[in-house]
């Protein structure tokens, strides 16, 4: 297919009761009404969500998401993990929601309902049947394909090669001093899931069917709250996360949390707080504090000590450990001015190959510093300055360093219905390991956090214009120029040159 990306969204809502919509997406390189795709867009998502009709709190048809407890059984939410603010860390999941994004993996397809049994009791039930992408060989599912790309023949060969059925339920009690929940999920593939065995994936989910049961709780007493969840899988292996939160006056938050995710615990759709990306093979202890130390100065800090009982990808040694620590000081004397400085230290054991080809597992240390200044002028002009530094090295080895400086300005015109955002960034890193990432404003629904490495500059312009209350135009143009490269990326995405540009156009119609 041609190299342009585009998507189409239609959404309808009536008050806060009825939501309906369709999302269609074509990734760059995917065929459009041609080749192996005669139906136009590569991905379609339809949904209908109804709220607060009698005893029915929520009814979802089509594509939807569900998340319960603290994610040890099922969670399709996007979360910031340990880097979330302490006030939101450990918030309970939100139950049933519509799936209106272009994510082609984290959703379910079928029906979900939330029914109010009594004043404080709610019962949810959900069913899903969907085709999924994956690599299938010798009647086994070798891996699940989650990126949603269908550009080449080899990618089309992995499209809709397997099916997954899922049924689940959640019983929830919402009391004055406590919240209790019980979640059960059963899901089955049409073929056994059996990844090719590697040293790190011995305990990955394997088999045709999986079921998990978990109980979550939250107790309140004055300014204390105790919360957590414990779950087991079909083999009786368990995972647990428990947190104590103290919230005195003045915006102070003190959190102490422990987690234990057994190396053999298996849940296909679990996602929770941790150093790893799965609820498996990890235990840890976290302590965090957010408080005002002076009139205009707020301090945020945390320390997370973690341990992996079994081997991991690029870690061929069992029983490795690490530390993740953060300290941030924020200064905000007025509504218009805010600045902070942040330092983050992370130490993890990883495999390292020496010059003589010998391999050993030694500590890898990553240090990051950021200074950020936000300044606004009479709700018209907003300025943001960022300076980033990162240093990464294995113990006893030379370090990889990276620097980035960026400046952005957002201006809202009062005589015109126009908002303009400009940004520029200069970066200089030794290699890919010391890459730096910043948030960049884009058009609605397009989340942009580009990573920068080697040497170069990035410039972006974002404009939003309201023709009237029904028509909104938005456009973004960005270009990245590298000073020390004559080729960018590799394989299908390789660019023969030192400049990479991107253009976004969006038209919104509101009725």
Question: How would you label these PLM feature ranges?
Answer:
Residues 25-43, 97-104, 157-160, 231-233, ...:
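Outer-membrane beta-barrel proteins
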Residues 2-3, 36-41, 59-63, 127, ...:
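Beta-stranded membrane pore/translocator domains
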Residues 105-152, 160-162, 166-170:
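Aromatic- and glycine-enriched pocket-lining scaffold segments that form the walls
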Residues 38-96, 100-133, 248-267, 417-432:
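Outer membrane beta-barrel
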Residues 3-5, 162-195, 202-511:
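Exposed, low-structure sequence patches enriched in small/polar residues
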Residues 80-91, 137-153, 441-446:
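Surface-exposed loop/turn segments flanking beta-strands in extracellular/periplasmic regions
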Residues 2-7, 12-20, 24-30, 36-44, ...:
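Outer-membrane beta-barrel translocator/receptor signature
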Residues 10, 48, 59, 113, ...:
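Conserved catalytic-core segments centered on acid/base and nucleophilic motifs
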